[in-house]
Amino acid sequence: MNAVTDTPVTEMPAPFVFTDAAADKVKQLIEEEGNADLKLRVFVQGGGCSGFQYGFTFDEAVNEDDTVMNKSGVQLLIDSMSYQYLVGAEIDYKDDINGAQFVIKNPNATTTCGCGSSFSV
């Protein structure tokens, strides 16, 4: 309940899904790097055969315009420009017959390329 208005407070759903598999893999990679200050930054940039492509990197800094999500002790960072393209997306880690990789399932993508790392909206 909101103490000011006595109305129920509804929690907003998380803007992204950061799966347990992805968080566990990031945690493992951070431990291998030996730097507990690292966070996973997921971003969108121009390029690829469909117009935009996903990127992943480690970062120690949280920028003012970053959205931060915590999962299993791991921080996921998404900058404000990338946020608009990733709202509702699932960030996962798959290790199967096709190889091991981070995968983004993005409901905003209207087309994707065969490799899955490039998309258009």
From Swiss-Prot:
Pfam families listed in its UniProt record: Fe-S_biosyn
GO BP term (any one): iron-sulfur cluster assembly
Gene3D superfamilies for the chain: HesB-like domain (2.60.300.12)
GO molecular function, one term: 4 iron, 4 sulfur cluster binding
Tree of life domain: Bacteria
Entry binding sites for iron-sulfur cluster: C49, C113, C115
Keyword set, alphabetical order: Iron, Iron-sulfur, Metal-binding
Cofactor entry: iron-sulfur cluster
Co-factor binding details: Binds 1 iron-sulfur cluster per subunit.
NCBIfam families documented for this protein: iron-sulfur cluster assembly accessory protein, PRK13623.1
Entry's family note: Belongs to the HesB/IscA family.
Assembly and oligomerization: Homodimer.
Function: Required for insertion of 4Fe-4S clusters.
Protein name: Putative iron-sulfur cluster insertion protein ErpA 1
